[in-house]
Amino acid sequence: MVLAVGRLRPPFHDDVQHYRRLLARHAKLELIEVREDEGVERRLPRAPAAGGSGAFVSLLAADGRQYDSVAFSRFLEDRRQAGRDVWFVVGGPYGTDVPQAEHRLSLGPMTLPHQLARVVLLEQLYRAHKILAGEPYHH
């Protein structure tokens, strides 16, 4: 699940749709867009009860954890093995705060436009699933 602030615009829309089609073979992916004034908190799943295995919320953030592609694929597989759906939250141009996020993910040390961050995230999700499936794509 990718929850993003703001409406995706060209040329990024086509790239996101491209990776969405590629990912469909490997995983169910839902993209939800919210207006900047709407806030993301009300669209996120409720926190699981103590010891529960509800959704895992990861906020894309400059100060988040960075992974190489293989480690990111293991991160996803660990959540899958735990029976947890992963929700990635992509903030708007001014960022966003998600207090219930269990994890903060950085796509790298450079600042990216929030719409480009969606493309990079989907490409990395596709790459991770190809790695997990043992299929060629990642070199």
Model-assigned labels for residue ranges:
Residues 1-23:
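N-terminal beta1-alpha1 ligand-phosphate binding loop
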Residues 94, 98-139:
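Structured adenosyl-cofactor binding patch, chiefly the S-adenosyl-L-methionine
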Residues 12-14, 68-70, 97-100, 116:
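Short glycine-/acidic-enriched loop or helix-start segments at secondary-structure transitions
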Residues 26-87, 93:
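S-adenosyl-L-methionine/SAH cofactor-binding core of RNA-modifying enzymes
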Residues 3, 32, 58, 103-105:
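Hydrophobic/aromatic beta-strand patches that form the interior of the parallel beta-sheet core
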